[in-house]
Design a protein with these regions (language model features):
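C-terminal edge-of-domain segments
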Residues: 150
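Conserved small/polar residues in nucleotide/adenosyl-binding loops
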Residues: 153-154
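A polyanion-binding, active-site-adjacent surface
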Residues: 2-127, 133-147
């Protein structure tokens, strides 16, 4: 295995998808290697069940977002996000893959997102959802520290 110093730094291949009506920002960690993509949009790996779950929940059809048996429909995914006010992005802008796979366990974040910059583009955003531990850890590391909340019960 190569050391992180000899592995290439990958820049994020997609820009944030931020519809004007974004109320919810969904953040993952980083896309899988391009060889695993079935569309040019977020969660492109046909093995990932996110689009199937959303199809089942919103349309009672786990195949709703499938264009073919081996590809998701980028157009349907984007239309859904626009309709529901869902923005999508990742918490890492540059990474090093310690192994040539999609596992968050083997991603080294070089440059995290700037949440202030992203949120400034979506003033109606009410919530942020992260899709995994790596995304959560990366997001938290970019936020300023906060004081302990005051307890009203002693």
């Amino acid at each position: 295995m190569k050391t992180p110093a000899t592995q290439p730094i990958e820049q994020h291949p997609l820009g944030f998808f931020l519809p004007e009506n974004t109320k919810l920002l969904m953040l993952g960690s980083f896309p899988p290697p391009r060889a695993r993509w079935s569309m040019n949009f977020y969660y492109p790996n046909i093995q990932n069940d996110m689009w199937r779950i959303l199809g089942l929940v919103f349309y009672n059809d786990k195949e709703y977002f499938l264009e073919t048996k081996k590809a998701f429909s980028e157009e349907k995914a984007k239309a859904f996000c626009r309709e529901k006010g869902i923005g999508i992005g990742d918490t890492a802008m540059e990474i090093i893959r310690l192994k040539n796979n999609a596992s968050d366990n083997f991603l080294q974040v070089v440059t995290p997102l700037n949440p202030v910059e992203v949120l400034a583009k979506i003033p109606e955003c009410e919530a942020i959802v992260v899709t995994g531990q790596k995304a959560m850890d990366t997001l938290i590391a970019t936020l300023p520290p906060v004081e302990e909340p005051l307890s009203l019960i002693h």
